[in-house]
Amino acid sequence: MTTILKHLPAGQRIGIAFSGGLDTSAALLWMRQKGAVPYAYTANLGQPDEDDYDAIPRRAMEYGAENARLIDCRKQLVAEGIAAIQCGAFHNTTGGLTYFNTTPLGRAVTGTMLVAAMKEDGVNIWGDGSTYKGNDIERFYRYGLLTNAELQIYKPWLDTDFIDELGGRHEMSEFMIACGFDYKMSVEKAYSTDSNMLGATHEAKDLEFLNSSVKIVNPIMGVKFWDESVKIPAEVVTVRFEQGHPVALNGKTFSDDVEMMLEANRIGGRHGLGMSDQIENRIIEAKSRGIYEAPGMALLHIAYERLLTGIHNEDTIEQYHSHGRQLGKLLYQGRWFDSQALMLRDGLQRWVASQITGEVTLELRRGNDYSILNTVSDNLTYKPERLTMEKGDSVFSPDDRIGQLTMRNLDITDTREKLFGYAKAGLLTASSATGLPQVENLENKAK
């Protein structure tokens, strides 16, 4: 069986991930006119720039959908977002600012839940709006086939017939109008935006050029913190975790994770927290650039890692960061449910997240400027009395430290011998000042 269909399978049911935008609207109408039987599936991911989800399936029916369904994906999306925080599943960072993999998380949820809904309706051909140059085409491909082994893929944007007829937004708009739909193109922005409840991605067009900065972006989840005319008063915030799960913000307990994430977004968004500018490596190894928003994820991540550093030992923290980066890359590649990812997730959630209980107090200011004011947890292994510089009972004595330092003589001796060995091999030069070999000065070497 051919998995990827290059041309429209007339007479067959085709499920399309329908956003209600121009691209998917024109594609749905075109498929119906060409003899296919389109079914529309819309994911409610809590997109901050969408205010009427119920209207989207209605529009799909108007454009010729045999059936149209709205799938509420918010609960699952937030669950996966919290899991990513618990595991530190983030591998793209620049200057200490993190991309929280919000688009990959959204694709993991959309790609599985929409295909599961299609399967219920007996629809085994799936199309979406991803292009062949991006990451999403592979993410959706993997998640779709994981969910339905009989799935076939048809994408209008890979069909030369569709491209020849409706290859641009102007052509698609004219097509909709000619078919009796008063569809007006939205005002063109200097970049494109994709969002869900966890975060927003701004990329392409002007943002492909590195001399275009965050200042051309109009945030949809936060504020223009770089604009001095925007007043952003400082705000003290408390975040509480229980066994790795965020349960309270500013003393208010949430039984609904969706409501908790919405409130975290509101709090962080008031300050522009969690915005970052990243150059990243796409799945196909080419570099791309994006500007990201994730105010709620950033707020929870800061509090979680503060508790983490106070509760776990150094080696556990090192493994958390190392395994988290590995897991973040797998998530980015569309492998969130692969066995190697599940193995990493299980270990991080079981042995790291389970102990993260406590409350962190922060002061948020502008953008990613914040201070940690207090950290409280019954699980803290940070105990100031162990290393206090003041007089008092100590857990170890000066004689204990002398013994510990004396034991270091063994590896210091080994290291000294290694340095002289490197010098004999010509890798290091002798220093007249210290008597120890040293790396040759590059400036002197150039002379």
Swiss-Prot record:
Root EC class: ligase
Keyword Protein biosynthesis among UniProt keywords: no
Compartment(s) of residence: Cytoplasm
Binding, L-citrulline: 99, 135, 139, 192, 201, 203, 280
E.C. number(s) listed in UniProt: 6.3.4.5
Gene Ontology terms: biological process: argininosuccinate metabolic process; L-arginine biosynthetic process; urea cycle
Protein name in UniProt: Argininosuccinate synthase
